[in-house]
């Protein structure tokens, strides 16, 4: 069977298999000559002789080289504010907390530490790609080099220095902080493209093909995600520039105490809480709707917020309506499962984690594993019904902001 893959996306033409490769459905290779000066079969747009010719004889990358590049990308510095704000950037780029340190992380910490997923290359290698909650100091948990000191202070002051009253501005800022981190992470993944491309050095041709095919599909998905993020950034920037937050939407769950699970992240939901598809993430020519989830503690009450902007109403209103249609006692377990299933920027109270049964911990780690695995197809497992009962602060009220869904507290 002959397979030819040609994709056009955002002006980039990718043709990794246009020349040289004929495949069976098991992806094994048939011999076919490729000229030394032809574009390489991997889609790099580099001549074959300077790319994959004799790739099997090249020295594999050293672990320390991979770790160095990984750390360089994940420690790069930028201010994520709108371009029109750049002239006001002041002070150093700081390691901004996506989950507030003093009010939130400290509230659930034990001896200054929380449990979280370490994202360094060394940690991933040590754990063989398996998710593992490890101790992280609250000075380092949830941080990224995404804002200068001035804009981090000024933009997020209504969250950091005021009690949470579920204003549209505060709900907007919850969504914006999660969005900024996701944009930073996706740009970082794009910057690691060269590193991924060299991962097949020293390997035989069949392994080279498998690695480059996976790379190609990953790159395609990541580029699509970046285009989505650019689309949404226009809306976030416009609200900040005009100081107009009327497009912010949110469903807020408040609690008597700090949530023992802290999260800050954004997703493009593909299923609602009944397991129904709500948007097709495989349609790369269509911009997808975006939803942010944040939990934190303002010193008086715990908050878990689902927030988005008006341009994502079509999907997000369906998703949240399906959650609010559940029995009230099911809200918390489903939300906990949703956080573990969809986000890696999750931080857990060590004491809470130890208080949960081994069965509960296994359920959540299974969902966590589904989240970070590239081998598991998208599914609604864990978000349609409670898989267990978890210890959690008392749910106080449910508040909707900016759109006409209502529920009784």
Task: For the regions a language model picked out, list residue spans one by one.
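Intrinsically disordered, low-complexity linkers and tails
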Residues: 2-37, 53-64, 70-73, 77
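Short Cys/His-based metal-binding microdomains
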Residues: 38-40, 46-55, 101-102
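Charge-dense, low-complexity intrinsically disordered regions
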Residues: 221-409
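An N-terminal structural lobe/cap that precedes and organizes the functional/catalytic core
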Residues: 53-153, 157-159
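Internal, well-ordered alpha/beta segment that forms a basic, Gly-enriched binding/recognition surface
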Residues: 112-217
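Short Cys/His-rich zinc-binding micro-motifs
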Residues: 30-46, 80-84
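Composition- and surface-driven signal marking solvent-exposed, interaction-prone regions
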Residues: 54, 161-162, 319-321
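Generic recognition of flexible, low-complexity loop/linker segments
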Residues: 28-30, 37-38, 67-68, 249-252, ...
């Amino acid at each position: 069977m002959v397979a030819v893959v040609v994709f056009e996306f955002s002006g980039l033409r990718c043709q990794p298999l246009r020349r040289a490769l004929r495949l069976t459905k098991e992806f094994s290779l048939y011999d076919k000559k490729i000229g030394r000066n032809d574009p390489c079969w991997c889609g790099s747009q580099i001549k074959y002789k300077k790319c994959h010719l004799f790739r099997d004889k090249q020295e594999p990358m050293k672990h320390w080289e991979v770790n160095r590049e990984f750390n360089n990308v994940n420690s790069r510095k930028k201010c994520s504010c709108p371009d029109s704000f750049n002239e006001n950037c002041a002070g150093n780029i700081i390691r901004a907390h996506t989950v507030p340190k003093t009010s939130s992380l400290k509230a659930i910490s034990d001896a200054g530490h929380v449990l979280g997923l370490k994202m360094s290359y060394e940690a991933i290698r040590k754990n063989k790609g398996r998710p593992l909650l490890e101790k992280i100091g609250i000075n380092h948990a949830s941080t990224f080099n995404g804002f200068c000191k001035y804009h981090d202070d000024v933009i997020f002051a209504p969250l950091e220095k005021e009690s949470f009253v579920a204003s549209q501005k505060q709900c907007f800022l919850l969504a914006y902080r999660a969005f900024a981190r996701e944009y930073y992470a996706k740009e970082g993944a794009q910057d690691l493209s060269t590193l991924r491309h060299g991962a097949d050095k020293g390997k035989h041709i069949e392994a080279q093909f498998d690695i480059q095919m996976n790379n190609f599909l990953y790159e395609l998905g990541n580029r699509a995600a970046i285009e989505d993020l650019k689309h949404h950034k226009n809306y976030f920037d416009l609200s900040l520039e005009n100081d107009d937050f009327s497009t912010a939407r949110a469903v807020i769950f408040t609690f008597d105490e700090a949530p023992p699970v802290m999260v800050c992240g954004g997703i493009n939901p593909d299923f609602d809480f009944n397991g129904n598809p709500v948007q097709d993430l495989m349609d790369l020519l269509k911009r997808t709707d975006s939803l942010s989830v944040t939990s934190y503690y303002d010193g008086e009450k715990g908050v878990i917020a689902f927030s988005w902007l008006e341009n994502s109403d079509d999907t997000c209103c369906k998703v949240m309506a399906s959650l609010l249609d559940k029995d009230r006692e099911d809200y918390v377990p489903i939300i906990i499962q949703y956080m573990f299933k969809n986000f890696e920027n999750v931080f857990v109270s060590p004491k809470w984690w130890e208080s949960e049964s081994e069965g509960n911990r296994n359920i959540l780690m299974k969902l966590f594993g589904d989240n970070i695995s590239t081998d598991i197809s998208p599914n609604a497992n864990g978000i349609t019904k409670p898989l267990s009962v978890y210890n959690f602060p008392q749910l106080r009220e449910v508040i909707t902001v900016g759109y006409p869904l209502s529920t009784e507290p």
